[in-house]
Amino acid sequence: MFQPAQAPWINPGVVIHDAGAPVDELIAKFANSAARRGFLVAACAQRGETMVDLVSGEPLAGTPLEVAARTLRVAMRDDADLAVIGGFDGFRHAAVELTASIGQGATQGMPVLTTIPDGRVLEWHDFIGHGGTMIAPTTRALWRWWGPERLYRDLALGVAADEVRQIAVGPRWLMVQGPAGAGLAYLPRNSRELVGRIAELKRKSLRQLAELSGSWDPLEMAVGIAAINAHYNRFDLEGEMGNGASAFGHEAGRVVVIGAFPGLSETLSNPQVIEADPRPGEYPTVAMDSLLPGCAAAVVASSTLINRNLPRILRLAQGSRIALVGPATPLTHRLFHYGCEILGGLVVRDARGLGEAIRAGALPREFGRFGHYLHLKREDAPAESGCRFRARP
């Protein structure tokens, strides 16, 4: 049995800042955001004469160096998801005192973050060598350091331990229904094995099913994504109509599409389409490495979430406008920090009817009879006229 998929190693990060800049506020905001999402975070920084826990806001007893060492010790003991030590002096002291692993090794590469004024960068290099990452003092740069590979656990952490009310398995698609919504996922292989496990899976909570998104088994992975969507794509979710891809219809630069979808030619002008089984005029999957860097925008099929290509795509298209679209897209703001600007997915209205259709082999073009395609946009996305829609239960 394989261990659950782990996010890759992250090099220790240092935020480079001007002397006197309010960098502790930046790292506190980042630490709090990670903690609110459910990640285990140990974080401290100095405010005035007092050391403070950046997650709780409570003062911490001891000298700055003592508190830094204690924070890193607790993070390692608890196998925290993130350790934040405000100020390079405290970080260096803690690492040396505890002989903490700053390179490949212990704790599966626990992300460690600190700060340093730009005039002391050489001290960072002398201490860390070539194994560290320098980070610009922006929220977006911090999330890029954190990495899109962690989006799966992020999504699962937000799912409530609710009752699973229905699991519908068809030849190519799967639906999981919870008390507040229903979610879909594409099945990457024959579903026969999954059909025999429905009773077992239905006894689990929605949160337990969502945790299967960390599985290496493709069918379990699909169950996990469907459960995630059952939580976030609520029956009463509000958004703008359509999958949102039309927002890229007037882009001046190249628009890359990962996975063709109905109405593509009417939505986008001269897109560069990448498909696993390309037709004439389309590109194979290997072309992602050449086409995504430097593109103006990318429209990405939600199936990439299930086959685990999405984190790679987000890295390759870093800095470009990105829309994640398709029936299996989780409609949650959690994905915006990982680089998505637009999220277009399905909000189910008739879960019973859709479940029956999926068992009978329905294809995505038929799903609209049982719900509505809506999209969410990141706050800083360019304005575009659209029609708001509230899904009905």
What are the language-model segments listed below?
Residues 304-373:
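Accessory, usually C-terminal, subdomains that scaffold auxiliary metal cofactors
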Residues 2, 16-20, 36, 47, ...:
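Electropositive, gly/pro-rich neighborhoods at or near active sites that engage anionic ligands
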Residues 103-109, 267-268, 291-293, 314-319:
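Short, conserved loop/helix-junction motifs that constitute active-site signature segments
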Residues 242-246, 282-294:
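Short acidic low-complexity segments
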Residues 2-35:
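Glycine-rich P-loop/Walker A and Walker A-like loops and their local beta1-loop-alpha1 context
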Residues 256-276:
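Short, charged N-terminal beta->alpha structural module
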Residues 48-99, 103, 296-299:
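Conserved nucleotide-sensing/catalytic segment adjacent to the nucleotide-binding pocket
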